[in-house]
Amino acid sequence: MNTVLGKAMVVLSAFTADDHGVGFAELQRRTGLPKATLHRLLTELVAVRLLDRDDSRYRLGRQLFELGMRASVERGLIEVATPFMEDLYERTHETVHLGVLEDSEVVYVAKIGGHRQASSPSRIGGRMPLHCTAIGKALLAHAPDELRSQVLTGPLPRRTPRTITAPGMLAKQLDAIVEAGVSFEFEEAAVGIVCVAAPVLDASDRPIAAVSATGPITRFRPQAHATQVRAAAAGISATLARRPRTESHTP
């Protein structure tokens, strides 16, 4: 592997489950990398917390553990959500998304759509702002007060002429979303695209994810599908709640 990423993977793969700390010389023996290259990679991997360094010895970092746990959580979430998303797609015949909250953005982790799917800007693994997407607003409405305040006091970038950029207007929408259990987006993230979303909540009403149906404004009426989207989100929430704790959304 001649790429930087490939070489970084060689270094990470050189560690075993039994390693409690590996020295530079042993890592060079295991990887076969030149000293200068290995030193640079180790420095960068420590900087991003993929490796920890204790004196002159290295071990796998906590960030790797956190990434692994996140991947496991998302796989379980997607496994539970998929049947409900497929049913929602059959009912709406429009693009169905599943998104999760990460930092101050929504990350799309699953997407179902047929040949009629809208030309939405979303993609699996892609990120979008919270304030201009139906999924983002559904998540933000149920997010901790600290995050809501952070978003409302920060800049609200305009993506289209219909993007909400006034904090007061967004705050009123978020309160209404909590009451209604559903959020809407009307050409706020992309011109010509409308969306309806509902939050997937845990037993404490904290947001686990949100599910949505998205379509072109020329044929899709979000309000007409609000009940179906809300039912899909409720079904995902209920199914997650019945799963053993080791398989649920929380470690």
Task: Give the ranges of each region predicted by the language model.
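Cysteine/selenocysteine-centered motifs that mediate thiol-based redox chemistry or coordinate metal-sulfur cofactors
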Residues: 147-158, 234-251
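Short hydrophobic alpha-helical segments used for membrane anchoring or interfacial signaling
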Residues: 98-103, 112
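Extended hydrophobic
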Residues: 163-239, 251
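Short amphipathic alpha-helical signal-transduction/dimerization elements
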Residues: 16, 136, 140, 144, ...
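Short, solvent-exposed recognition segments
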Residues: 117-189
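Short N-terminal helix-loop-first-beta-strand/juxtamembrane motif that initiates sensory/input modules
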Residues: 91-96, 179-182
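N-terminal helix-turn-helix
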Residues: 1-78, 237-242
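Conserved segment of winged-helix/HTH DNA-binding domains
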Residues: 63-91, 117-120
